Amino acid sequence: MGQKVNPEGLRLGIVKTWQSRWYADKEYADFILEDFKLREFVKKKLHHAGIAKVEIERSLNRIRLRIFAARPGIVIGKKGNEIEQLKNEIRQKVVAGKDLAIDIQEVKKPETVAQLVAENVAGQLERRVAFRRAMKRGVSSAMRFGVKGIKIICSGRLGGAEMARREWYREGRVPLHTLRADVDYGFVEASTTYGRIGVKVFIFKGEVLKDERKKN
């Protein structure tokens, strides 16, 4: 089962927490759609900033966005001009009439964040870099920054082949069935001249909960 399911969803409430934190009764579906639109808008608007994830918290008519970015300077801009412009655009296009607060957090090691690694590999594929070279670069740079293991999967018409196939490259351990393992996951689709290529990245950063069996 661990091989099939999203590793972050499988670990929610164990070693992972929710990226949307709020409670709603009748407006539940509306809030889910609004969260989806918020994330899509932020990622499209700030695609050069290296957005790892967007956390959303709600209280009454207030929404707080926490944006994790590899290049926070692009998001903030000179004297905070860019972030004010972003706030205004979100208020106009996505969350009309709601109070909005935005926090920016820097991602210290983007080479160890699965979503950013996947985006980097996908970007190389779109620039016609050989898929094996792109995968090996991603793996070697992550291992250099001290992760316990990484696995990258590319699937589609690799190298312009007639038949779609799936290839993967792994280094270290990536225990997808171990629930106490901190496994980061990222997925991106690369749009190439031959069609779309899916890029999945799994990064194992170590075990969060101690193994109680060793004590007994």
Swiss-Prot record:
**Superkingdom per UniProt:** Bacteria
Give an example GO molecular function. structural constituent of ribosome
Q: What does this protein do?
A: Binds the lower part of the 30S subunit head. Binds mRNA in the 70S ribosome, positioning it for translation.
Please give the coiled-coil regions recorded for this protein: none
User: In this protein, which residues make up the domain named KH type-2?
Assistant: 38-108
Q: Name one Pfam family in it.
A: KH_2
Q: Which InterPro entries match?
A: KH_dom, KH_dom-like_a/b, KH_dom_type_2, KH_sf_prok-type, Ribosomal_S3_C_sf, Ribosomal_uS3_bac-typ, Ribosomal_uS3_C, Ribosomal_uS3_CS
Q: Which GO terms describe its biological process?
A: translation
- Assembly and interaction partners: Part of the 30S ribosomal subunit. Forms a tight complex with proteins S10 and S14.
Q: Which UniProt keywords apply?
A: Ribonucleoprotein, Ribosomal protein, RNA-binding, rRNA-binding
> What is one term from the GO cellular component aspect held by the record?
cytosolic small ribosomal subunit
Designated name of the protein: Small ribosomal subunit protein uS3
Q: Which family does it belong to?
A: Belongs to the universal ribosomal protein uS3 family.
